[in-house]
């Protein structure tokens, strides 16, 4: 089974992806994690990507698609793609690569739909563990240690630090989603991400179960 999950910044893609790969025994390919790892390497590519991310712009398709192709070469056809595709061009690329490698396409597409004001509030308060990628809200999480892996490396993401960049990312997401919804019509499961984590998980699993019947 090949699942892709996307949604606006702050919609909980990483959290839901972690739960889904455990339930359905899938390999995870997270575009966001790949980019953050490259940025932390301080390579020339990392510096270039960091500047793009901090400004709220999208990374060039050439870079993203190259990273994805490399990752797909390492997994079988039971995987979950977190945060890819991000536009119609990337969707066409994904179909081509999956057809070449597995002679198939994506089975299920999950879109997490989130109100803009809630997305902004979550991003302003988001705290991430640099080691295990767990996400917390600074308004409710007062510890200096990650509850999951006990790491003390808790920081705000660089792309959450600037309000204008946040607004730009959200606007760009809505702009790109119009084409993606049409492209994946018939495979698209829309989920209300304004709900609690558990409620979102239940809705996703329920719709996936119905889709697999």
UniProtKB/Swiss-Prot annotation:
It is an enzyme of class 2 (transferase). Residues 125-160 are annotated as: LID. It is found in: Cytoplasm. Its main location: cytoplasm. It comes from the Bacteria. It catalyses: AMP + ATP = 2 ADP. Keywords: ATP-binding, Cytoplasm, Kinase, Metal-binding, Nucleotide biosynthesis, Nucleotide-binding, Transferase, Zinc. Transmembrane segments: none annotated. AMP binds at residues 36, 57-59, 83-86, 90, 157, 169. GO terms for cellular component: cytoplasm. Pathway: Purine metabolism; AMP biosynthesis via salvage pathway; AMP from ADP: step 1/1. Its EC number is 2.7.4.3. ATP binds at residues 10-15, 126, 135-136, 195. Belongs to the adenylate kinase family. Consists of three domains, a large central CORE domain and two small peripheral domains, NMPbind and LID, which undergo movements during catalysis. The LID domain closes over the site of phosphoryl transfer upon ATP binding. Assembling and dissambling the active center during each catalytic cycle provides an effective means to prevent ATP hydrolysis. Some bacteria have evolved a zinc-coordinating structure that stabilizes the LID domain. Monomer. This is Adenylate kinase. The lineage of its organism: Bacteria, Pseudomonadati, Pseudomonadota, Alphaproteobacteria, Rickettsiales.
